[in-house]
Amino acid sequence: MGKYQVVRKHEIHCGHRVYQHESKCRNLHGHSYVFHLKCSSENLDSLGRVIDFSVIKELLCKWLDDNWDHKMILWDQDPLFTELLKLDSSVVSIPYNPTAENLARYLVETVGPQLFARLPITLSEVTLEETSKCSASYAISN
């Protein structure tokens, strides 16, 4: 049986660093991230939709705006995390080094299930563009 999929695109601006990166990405820096948020369902609603796009906007895009937009995202094991948090409450952490791959993973494995728990959809894949030339994806494997 197939699945229906819809994609909502959303852009935020935030900073990060890749702890122990071998070149300049080890430094604090920022991106204009573009997220491609793919939601899936085996069934359509009574109007023939996976879900109204406004629901994705109200839940997932709002979460991104509230939690990551104009914030500094660091790995919770990064020595800079606790030091920067003392200076600025806009520093947030995730349980992995905040590469594009891991940010996508965090959304699919942690945020999506929390936000969509009562809905008949799954956040099945996130593609994250760091630049117009570089992107990374994470998807639920079937």
Where are these regions (language model features)?
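Charge-rich, low-complexity N-terminal segments
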Residues: 1-142
